[in-house]
Amino acid sequence: TVASQVDAAFEVLILTHGFSPVPSELRARARSLGVESLQLLTAEPGVPLGECLNLLVRASSGDVVAKMDDDDLYGPRYLSDQLHAMDYSGADVVGKQAHYMYLKGLDATILRFPEREHRYTDFVAGPTIMARRELAIGIPFPATSRGEDTAFLRNAAAAGATLYAADRFNFVQVRSDGGIAHTWDVTSSELLANSRVEFFGRNQGHIFW
């Protein structure tokens, strides 16, 4: 997903949590996919997720950092779309509030919060957080493993940062039977009750452009 990004210059930072892969294999794989800049970090199992994110932010070299979840799907223009939103909104943090979600157990794609796009906000979905690096350095993620995204957004807004919800496209959150990224307790029935079914299957051609 990262390697498929177009119209955006980027470096990839990967942090493995509690295990150490073979760097040469990862670098070879990255090169085969066209990724020119790759940094590999590791953290012990006891390091909270929020602190892992801070390690990645501090190791980055760009002006903007983007958090991407390997469980979810990102279209090839995801990064450029987010960067454009940051540019025209002037926001310090951008992301998706209106977004598609694929429910694996039902093979259905739903749309959540369709009215919450193209607007300034106080919340965006964690896997879509893109922030100015200077802000993420000054207001780090809390050293917790649950709620770190929400706390970061809340602290950023309290410090005067501007948050903007971009359009719904180029991102699909994937919900397996075990939950979203293994941190949500919400059920598929609850998600369906507060969303609308757009289509069965993934139909990424409608979402990615």
Name each model-derived stretch:
Residues 69-73:
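The conserved acidic donor/metal-binding loop of glycosyltransferases
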Residues 138-209:
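C-terminal catalytic/acceptor-binding lobe
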Residues 1-9, 33:
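Short, acidic, metal-binding catalytic loop of nucleotide-sugar glycosyltransferases
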Residues 50, 94, 100-101, 111-130:
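A recurrent flexible, glycine/aromatic-enriched loop bordering the glycosyltransferase active site
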Residues 65:
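Short aromatic/hydrophobic "clamp" motif used to bind/position activated sugar donors
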Residues 43-60:
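Glycine-rich, basic loop-to-helix element that forms the pyrophosphate-binding segment
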